[in-house]
């Protein structure tokens, strides 16, 4: 009889514990100190970060968080916790933990809780549909560092990404079609992904290609002219060139091209957060309308939708199948 004990570690980026300047400063300091996120030499970056960026940005960003904060807390944490609870309910014999790369719930404690249950197989599920060195790889780095403190390790499966998984594409397509039914068919469907510095892509990060994989699969799944689907990149930070076209610049230019109705979906975000609820739904709406556009709708993230939970269930069960790579190896899966 098998003595296997399974565990799942779901990981998302992170969020401040409160919408206050102090909490935001603490969160941003941890996030922006990660070399996977900003790889500027530490001697140059850290004085700039602590001397200028954190003091200036923290109060402003705290106000933005206040505008989207839910009764239960940060939207990212609220929806991620619901995802964890729903996935755990669908996998009654599997220990399911949630962690954030930065902030709470913290990775070291989540891993400690899993290993305390003597699990023999661990699935690490980054909640990033498209791999990037600044997100998925940062989780790999952090988990590896934490595990150096343990003598006994389980076999580990790391889900690299799921950019083209059929259940993921189907869930996105259903979400878009619901929006079309509710708001009508737009002149353009904007698929906005979080951006990364262009240099990261030039140095080998295949994130742009993984975004394009999702774009092409989603466009093919929709009953909508593919030429009216546009991919853009948001959330630029710093002065380095980032992936183009930029979402905000696209919003400025569309009305002059005769586009009056846009709908925007952000498939790289597994849960709604500041970047979707404030940057897209508020800021980019204002940009579009100020430029002369008339109708703007944001299509929510998949969050804890049943189809999304089913996708997560499929990802985990595939990684735990007996046909998966045998114990004693670390496997990397991309769907």
Curated annotation (Swiss-Prot):
It is found in: Cytoplasm. It holds the Pfam family Ferrochelatase. Its EC number is 4.98.1.1. Fe cation binds at residues 194, 275. It comes from the Bacteria. InterPro entries: Ferrochelatase, Ferrochelatase_AS, Ferrochelatase_C, Ferrochelatase_N. Keywords: Cytoplasm, Heme biosynthesis, Iron, Lyase, Metal-binding, Porphyrin biosynthesis. Its main location: cytoplasm. Transmembrane segments: none annotated. Belongs to the ferrochelatase family. This is Ferrochelatase. It comes from Sodalis glossinidius (strain morsitans).
């Amino acid at each position: 009889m098998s003595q296997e004990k399974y565990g799942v570690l779901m990981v998302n980026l992170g969020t401040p514990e409160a919408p206050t300047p102090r909490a935001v400063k603490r969160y941003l300091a941890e996030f922006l100190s990660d070399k996977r996120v900003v790889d500027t030499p530490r001697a140059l970056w850290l004085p700039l970060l602590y001397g200028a960026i954190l003091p200036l940005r923290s109060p402003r960003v705290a106000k933005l968080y206040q505008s989207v904060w839910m009764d239960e807390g940060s939207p990212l944490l609220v929806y991620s916790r619901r995802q964890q609870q729903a996935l755990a309910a669908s996998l009654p014999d599997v220990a399911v933990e949630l962690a954030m790369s930065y902030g709470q719930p913290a990775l070291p404690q989540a891993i400690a809780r899993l290993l305390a249950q003597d699990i023999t197989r661990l699935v690490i599920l980054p909640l990033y549909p498209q791999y990037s060195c600044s997100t998925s790889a940062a989780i790999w780095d952090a988990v590896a560092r934490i595990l150096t403190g343990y003598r006994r390790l389980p076999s580990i499966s790391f889900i690299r990404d799921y950019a083209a998984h059929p259940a993921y594409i189907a869930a996105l397509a259903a979400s878009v079609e619901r929006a079309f039914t509710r708001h009508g068919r737009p002149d353009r469907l904007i698929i906005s992904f979080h951006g990364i510095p262009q240099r990261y892509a030039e140095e080998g990060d295949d994130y742009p290609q993984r975004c394009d994989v999702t774009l092409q699969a989603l466009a093919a799944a929709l009953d909508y002219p593919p030429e009216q689907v546009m991919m853009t990149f948001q959330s630029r930070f710093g002065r380095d060139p980032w992936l183009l076209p930029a979402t905000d610049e696209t919003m400025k230019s569309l009305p002059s091209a005769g586009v009056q109705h846009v709908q925007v979906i952000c498939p790289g975000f597994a849960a709604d957060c500041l970047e979707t609820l404030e940057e897209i739904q508020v800021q980019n709406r204002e940009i579009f309308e100020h430029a002369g556009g008339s109708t703007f709708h944001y299509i929510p993230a998949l969050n804890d939708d049943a189809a999304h939970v089913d996708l997560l269930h499929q990802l985990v069960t595939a990684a735990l199948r007996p046909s998966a790579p045998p114990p004693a190896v670390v496997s990397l899966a991309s769907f």
